Amino acid sequence: MAEIIIKKRHAIKKGQLTSLMTKLKESIGDDAELYTAPMIEIAETTSRFNIYLINKKPILMEKDEWAFPTLRGAILRPFSGRRIVVDMGAVPYMVNGADIMRPGIVSVTPDVKAGYPALAVDESHGKPLAVVLPLYDADGILALGKGKAAKNLHYVGDELWNLEL
């Protein structure tokens, strides 16, 4: 990810909030309620995502068809579901931005869908390591013998993680 430059930043309107919450509810279900706040700002950036700020922290990210918590959002406001658990041997690669390969996957929650973000967590502590875009549904990932299972979108230490406002 290249350096993120904020072009514009403003509070979102009620209609935008409704659209955002609908997309978020599709992604993480009823846990979307964890991400409501009196004021949510949108930061239009040079990155491939729109970033939503709650209390001046980048908590949510949105692309055309989906919205999902950033790693900071997942840590500050933990939610259940949409998880791919990776073994501890994969952790050093994940935090350097590597995609998830099938041999490193321990388990997958059944709600993981191809093309919609999921959270990659370590098997020991369940700590979020990355936001990934699965290439297959949960059953497809588990059926894979080898190969790439998910693309890394946002990881600990990348530009979005280090974004300070």
State each model region's role.
Residues A2-F49, I54-S107, D111-A114, A118-L165:
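Beta-strand/loop-dominated core regions that host nucleotide or nucleotide-derived cofactor-binding catalytic loops
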